[in-house]
Amino acid sequence: MTAELNFLDLFLKASIVVQLVIVILISFSIISWAIIIQRSRILTNALKEARTFEDRFWSGEDLNKLYEGLSNRRDGLTGSEQIFCVGFKEFSRLKQVNPDAPEAIIKGTMRAMNLAMNREIESLENRVPFLATVASVSPYIGLFGTVWGIMHAFMALSGAKQATLQMVAPGIAEALIATAIGLFAAIPAVMAYNRLSLRVNAIEQDYGNFIDEFTTILHRQAFGKAPH
């Protein structure tokens, strides 16, 4: 006699605790995949936009015209564009307020650009830590469901005159499914978290490099030195 493994049948026959565990883990998995797809697209676009803006920045276009063009755009600025506009605006403001303090101008401008960069990175990292949470807790939630299910299966034997494997097999099977689903939720989440974190770090590095390069240009202007 062979028994066909039917997930729905095992789920319906499981105890309410195991059912709740399975529902939680499946929900975690669905949310994780939604975050993975959404964040992957956002990070891909952010990296592409950063590279595109840097090409435009180094194309020789006048910085005043570049700033005016970006400021007049109706769609929201993000990434390197936002960092550039914040830095250029702060530099211009500080230079008008106190033109004889170049060091203070540069420090204030860098502070403004770093704050803008931190806000951009925070936006890019939105919801990504949830993947780490899913990766950490899902196996333990699944293990809890397994332990509970096995306890439930053996407690059902307490009133039986003769215990057989056939009597406990369905209960053990439904319990082990909780562990399997826990791993199914955790493995993609931890892989995606590591991958997305690396991409965020790469974008942050690009932003940081741009700030350093832009600061060098502003430093020459603040101290009245022409570029070599």
UniProtKB/Swiss-Prot annotation:
Keywords: Cell cycle, Cell division, Cell inner membrane, Cell membrane, Membrane, Transmembrane, Transmembrane helix. Part of the Tol-Pal system, which plays a role in outer membrane invagination during cell division and is important for maintaining outer membrane integrity. The Tol-Pal system is composed of five core proteins: the inner membrane proteins TolA, TolQ and TolR, the periplasmic protein TolB and the outer membrane protein Pal. They form a network linking the inner and outer membranes and the peptidoglycan layer. It is found in: Cell inner membrane. The chain crosses the membrane at residues 16-36, 137-157, 172-192. Belongs to the ExbB/TolQ family. This is Tol-Pal system protein TolQ. GO terms for cellular component: plasma membrane. Changing residue 177 to V: In strain: 1479. It is a multi-pass membrane protein. HAMAP family: TolQ (MF_02202).
